[in-house]
Amino acid sequence: DEIMTGFGRTGRLFAFEHAGILPDIVTMAKGLTSSYAPLGAVGMRQGIADHYEDRIFWGGLTHNAHPLCLAAADASIQVLLDEGMVDNAATLEAVAREELNRLQSDHPSVAAGRVIGLLGMVDLQKNTSGAPFGGYGDKGSPVMKAFKRRLLEEGLYTYVRWSNFMVCPPLCIDEGTLREGFARIGRALDVVDDAFEA
């Protein structure tokens, strides 16, 4: 499943390349068009594709081969490759990791952070035992809602859910802008630190 990880997000064209495998089936979507147009695709080994030559699968035809979406995919992938954005994500992974480590050392509310390429996730905690601010399926604790508001005030929009948030900057970002983004996250985390139970 390369829907979130495909097309450079992890510093390789596809995340499965990090494991040195060649999957039988690959699903992809968002990165195909850089989310400018709706498009999804399934890639598969020839033997699997051959199976469907005489056994047509009639699902997923709503936007089948839509010319606008296909043109957006072609242009997006060309820019991604021509402008070195996959390499940029790989290069900036070290900067993102350094900044995530800084957040963890500067903010007691940061339990852990992980990153591959420019795909990151940060786990927050309300005490040293690692208890989350909100559980799975929770509609959002007041602390996490306040954190999201602070991020927006800082000019950042990201996925904040339960007791986690994502760090997924654009693949064209430069080092200075990436570091500034982390500085803004750090300022927003002050709200979460205020609720930390020491």
Q: Where are the language model's segments positioned?
A:
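Conserved N-terminal phosphate-binding loop of PLP-dependent enzymes in the Aspartate aminotransferase
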Residues: 2-198
